[in-house]
Amino acid sequence: MALSPEEVNHVAMLARLALSEDEKTAFAEQLTLILDYVERLNELDTGEVEPLIHILPVFNVLRQDEALPGSSQEEILSNAPLVEDGQYKVPRII
């Protein structure tokens, strides 16, 4: 499937790329080679191949949730530069 420089220009316009004429010609040749290779891959008979989600047999390895004691409000707020009424105080933005 040969791509013309005009088709490359159209794709470049959609991608908002500015290409020189030499680049358009070079990309047309390179993209043609890529598309030809993909066409060859499409010809493969994969009817006997089982669909894969992942190439390796990896499964989720999960651990049991364990509730741990949290920090107190005083401990958490002790790191803040400004605190007011048990809350972080930050400078006004607007």
UniProtKB/Swiss-Prot annotation:
InterPro entries: Asp/Glu-ADT_sf_sub_c (IPR036113), GatC (IPR003837)
Record-level Gene Ontology MF annotations: asparaginyl-tRNA synthase (glutamine-hydrolyzing) activity; ATP binding; glutaminyl-tRNA synthase (glutamine-hydrolyzing) activity
Keywords: ATP-binding, Ligase, Nucleotide-binding, Protein biosynthesis
GO biological process, one term: glutaminyl-tRNAGln biosynthesis via transamidation
UniProt key word Disulfide bond: no
Substrates-to-products reaction catalysed: L-glutamyl-tRNA(Gln) + L-glutamine + ATP + H2O = L-glutaminyl-tRNA(Gln) + L-glutamate + ADP + phosphate + H(+); L-aspartyl-tRNA(Asn) + L-glutamine + ATP + H2O = L-asparaginyl-tRNA(Asn) + L-glutamate + ADP + phosphate + 2 H(+)
Protein EC: 6.3.5.-
Pfam family, one: GatC
Subunit structure of this chain's protein: Heterotrimer of A, B and C subunits.
Family membership noted in the UniProt record: Belongs to the GatC family.
Primary role: Allows the formation of correctly charged Asn-tRNA(Asn) or Gln-tRNA(Gln) through the transamidation of misacylated Asp-tRNA(Asn) or Glu-tRNA(Gln) in organisms which lack either or both of asparaginyl-tRNA or glutaminyl-tRNA synthetases. The reaction takes place in the presence of glutamine and ATP through an activated phospho-Asp-tRNA(Asn) or phospho-Glu-tRNA(Gln).
NCBIfam families with a match to the protein in the record: gatC (TIGR00135)
Protein name: Aspartyl/glutamyl-tRNA(Asn/Gln) amidotransferase subunit C
Species name: Syntrophomonas wolfei subsp. wolfei (strain DSM 2245B / Goettingen)
Lineage summary: Bacteria, Bacillati, Bacillota, Clostridia, Eubacteriales
